[in-house]
Amino acid sequence: MSEQNNTEMTFQIQRIYTKDISFEAPNAPHVFQKDWQPEVKLDLDTASSQLADDVYEVVLRVTVTASLGEETAFLCEVQQGGIFSIAGIEGTQMAHCLGAYCPNILFPYARECITSLVSRGTFPQLNLAPVNFDALFMNYLQQQAGEGTEEHQDA
């Protein structure tokens, strides 16, 4: 009889936490006197690291900048962290789990934190739309594949 690989995929959330919060309203209070027609910029970034065997930290950084013309109305940054137990997967599946699946779990927490900070700054309510981290991850893989192709063509 041949030996079978009985490694099952396991995924468990150990902890979700706020790692860092920053809110700045550098032009308050005079920014409150202006017409509220902001240009809102959303910036996302993820980072992951292995803490122990099958234990990973994933940090989602969400930065929102609202500007009125040349002036910054507010800048809000949240780093939402999570510790996850992940076993039984590797390679591209692990990269997808750390780069898309975990950020999908963390984003609602970061979004709620940003909404609360903006509200406490007495700015109009900010509703961030859901983010498709799976699509962002696929775009990232396509960019990496394109860069790899260009490197081989240059050689």
From Swiss-Prot:
Gene3D superfamilies: SecB-like. GO terms for cellular component: cytoplasm. The keyword rRNA processing does not apply. GO terms for molecular function: unfolded protein binding. It is found in: Cytoplasm. GO terms for biological process: protein folding; protein tetramerization; protein transport. InterPro entries: SecB, SecB-like_sf. Its main location: cytoplasm. It comes from the Bacteria. Keywords: Chaperone, Cytoplasm, Protein transport, Translocation, Transport. Homotetramer, a dimer of dimers. One homotetramer interacts with 1 SecA dimer. One of the proteins required for the normal export of preproteins out of the cell cytoplasm. It is a molecular chaperone that binds to a subset of precursor proteins, maintaining them in a translocation-competent state. It also specifically binds to its receptor SecA. Belongs to the SecB family. PANTHER family: PROTEIN-EXPORT PROTEIN SECB, PTHR36918. HAMAP family: SecB. This is Protein-export protein SecB.
